[in-house]
Regions:
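Generic preference for hydrophobic/aromatic residues in regular secondary structure cores
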Residues: 6-9, 46, 54, 105
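Residue-level marker of intrinsically disordered, low-complexity segments enriched
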Residues: 5-7, 37, 42, 97
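Compositionally biased, intrinsically disordered low-complexity regions enriched in proline and serine
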Residues: 21, 53-55, 102
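Acidic, aromatic-enriched beta-alpha/helix-loop junctions
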Residues: 30-74
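Short, charged/polar N-terminal "headpieces" of proteins
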Residues: 1-33
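Intrinsically disordered, low-complexity segments enriched in small/polar residues
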Residues: 18, 48-52, 99
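Low-complexity intrinsically disordered segments
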Residues: 61-108
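Intrinsic-disorder/low-complexity regions
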Residues: 1-2, 10, 46, 59, ...
Length: 108
């Protein structure tokens, strides 16, 4: 798979939450990065910022492209994983199809 420049999957802002999620493909690897700022995060963890990262290896990135079935992987990612529940949907599709993603996160 060719590299794909970064696309925005979520750019949500409300009084209590800001959520920004992007996806890109580098070296055939799908990378999804998110950053949330919330009052709940500050109350739970002492910091309002929460960052998280998902990645699929090359093989599973290709499998995901086939599963989503769109000619344009960019379009398929936007249609399936946009909005506040996009990362949840990504995890569910991966789990239903045996795709192994890596996940990392941190606060602050």
């Amino acid at each position: 798979m060719n590299d794909m420049s970064r696309i925005v999957l979520c750019n949500f802002k409300s009084q209590n939450l800001q959520c920004y999620v992007t996806a890109e493909v580098k070296g055939g690897i799908l990378l999804i990065s998110g950053q949330d700022f919330s009052i709940a995060g500050e109350q739970l963890f002492g910091d309002s910022e929460y960052e998280y990262f998902y990645s699929l290896n090359k093989e599973d990135t290709e499998k995901l492209k086939t599963i989503l079935g769109e000619r344009s992987f960019r379009k398929a990612l936007k249609e399936n994983f946009s909005g506040l529940d996009g990362c949840k949907t990504f995890r569910e599709i991966c789990e239903m199809n045996g795709l192994r993603y890596e996940f990392n996160s941190y606060c602050g």
